[in-house]
């Protein structure tokens, strides 16, 4: 059975009963037994009223920028989490993408690979997981791989880490993304799972129209 990627977008200032909605969503996922979730803040975006919001003010919260929450879910968790999250999102967007299945292999030429992990600043003089991942992808001739840092999230330790509460936290979530050609996919996710000491790898088909 494939996994699914749930992606939620809403504005940072959205609240539910005086509590920040994005934080309530993380808590909801945590309570429903979701194994991990990552929250990121966009640098700009268009909201539900067609307003463009920019990263102008020093205190990021007052820019009311878009918040992106992503989580990889098993099929039996989808409806459960959807029922918990949907009532919280008064204005926003929720999408679900189906993960890779063996039947997808010959139907598509490219696949997007997303690795959800975290940084660990306690590993002095040692490579972070994301550095190992980038080195590995480089050997696979991947170009345009990206690493983005989250502002909150949790993983298998089930502890919610937050940049807002703990600005010096050494466990902030990271997302590594890239696109892989079909010929390079066999065995790649298995190798990535060996590199990623704490996190999850998600793969789904994608149409690549330019890569140079």
Predicted features along the sequence, with ranges:
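Positively charged, small/polar-rich N-terminal and surface patches that mediate targeting and assembly
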Residues: 1-212
